[in-house]
Amino acid sequence: MAGENHQWQGSILYNMLMSAKQTRAAPEAPETRLVDQCWGCSCGDEPGVGREGLLGGRNVSLLYRCCFCGKDHPRQGSILYSMLTNAKQTYAAPKAPEATLGPCWGCSCGSDPGVGRTGLPGGRPVALLYRCCFCGEDHPRQGSILYSLLTSAKQTHVAPAAPEARPGGAWWDRSYFAQRPGGREALPGGRAMGLLYRCCFCGEDHPQQGSTLYCMPTSTNQAQAAPEERPRAPWWDTSSGALRPVALKNPQVVCEAASAGLLKTLRFVKYLPCFQVLPLDQQLVLVRNCWASLLMLELAQDRLQFETVEVSEPSMLQKILTTRRRETGGDEPLPVPTLQHHLAPPAEARKVPSASQVQAIKCFLSKCWSLNISTKEYAYLKGTVLFNPDVPGLQCVKYIQGLQWGTQQILSEHTRMTHQGPHDRFIELNSTLFLLRFINANVIAELFFRPIIGTVSMDDMMLEMLCTKL
């Protein structure tokens, strides 16, 4: 019957009988014949050539006669074909293909259809591949948000440890990037996460330098770095560790030299003709205001050098016990020398000079020594410091202001004659006087004169030295 020509051949009944006969004869499902590369039929005009079913309720494969190649295969480009192809590739490929990270910028337009979709079992991320319109290869669409998310999630699970940043060459000062992130690596145990980016200059993966993330410490070890690696604070920074108390290493020699310098300073000031015409109270006002600065200029002229050592500052408990012992032991009348010592501030109550304050003194001396100031220049600088019209309590302000202006004029003429060229020497000499503002008179008194004069005030010493013949 099958090999003969019947009049019913081509009818619906004939086709049904032949289909039922072929179903019983072929217990196995024929495989789909996917030969040659064909774009497939997407119009759906051709009728179905065959319909093959599998026994036991298995899937049915629908074949269509392609209008391009004339062969029977599933209709490519249709929704059914895409679903079947994707399902077949999902079970066939257990591993996600790695993205081809070549020198291609990738396809960011999204005009090409997806070439493949690969899923991983266990709920792992899905890598979507696109046919690049630049290089013609299949790789994730670079530059898109989806590519960034998938690449970051993939490398987060792959890399167990964060590599160190590789600032190669001179690219470390670049603060921007144009390409995709090269990797994001997380450490187990809640440790810090290092984000790597592909640099648009050197082509390597390193942290985005110059950003807030790069400035943050990448590990707890860097946050707890040794204090030796940190830059030292300047001597005028009171928040640094330079507030430790210090004392003279050789107090007897240094204090005697400082006392001799103070005596020469007062002798220089006292016998100035323009200073002698002032009343005693005005002389005392000027000297009490500038004796420390004048002494520093004298010590710089004498080239006095000294060294200091750290001393242990008394604790708060020792201060409380000393004060309470002094208060409870004052019931009986004390003799005059003991009373004077009792009224004077004890050694624990006095402010001990700190290392930063002593460093300010040494900086001023070094500045003066570097300029090689002559004797006349020292004298003019002393006159500028002595005749200060801004001293509070001064009555003859105009007279003192004229003396300071005249001293500056003489110093300017002297530097112009001794040093050819512009007034750089005059400016450098006056810049040394600016450093005197960082030096406290009480520090000089405690450092150089307290071991000798004891509890005597420096103001009383100035009055006594002005009234006596030196």
Curated annotation (Swiss-Prot):
Sequence repeats lie at residues 1-67, 68-133, 134-200, 201-253. One of its GO terms (molecular function) is protein homodimerization activity. InterPro entries: NHR-like_dom_sf, NR0B1/2, Nucl_hrmn_rcpt_lig-bd, Nuclear_hrmn_rcpt, Nuclear_receptor_repeat. It is found in: Nucleus; Cytoplasm. Keywords: Cytoplasm, Nucleus, Receptor, Repeat, Repressor, Transcription, Transcription regulation. Residues 1-253 are annotated as: 4 X 67 AA tandem repeats. Its main location: nucleus. A motif (LXXLL motif 3) lies at residues 146-150. A motif (AF-2 motif) lies at residues 461-466. A motif (LXXLL motif 1) lies at residues 13-17. Homodimer. Interacts with NR5A1, NR5A2, NR0B2 and with COPS2. Interacts with ESRRB; represses ESRRB activity at the GATA6 promoter. This is Nuclear receptor subfamily 0 group B member 1. The lineage of its organism: Eukaryota, Metazoa, Chordata, Craniata, Vertebrata.
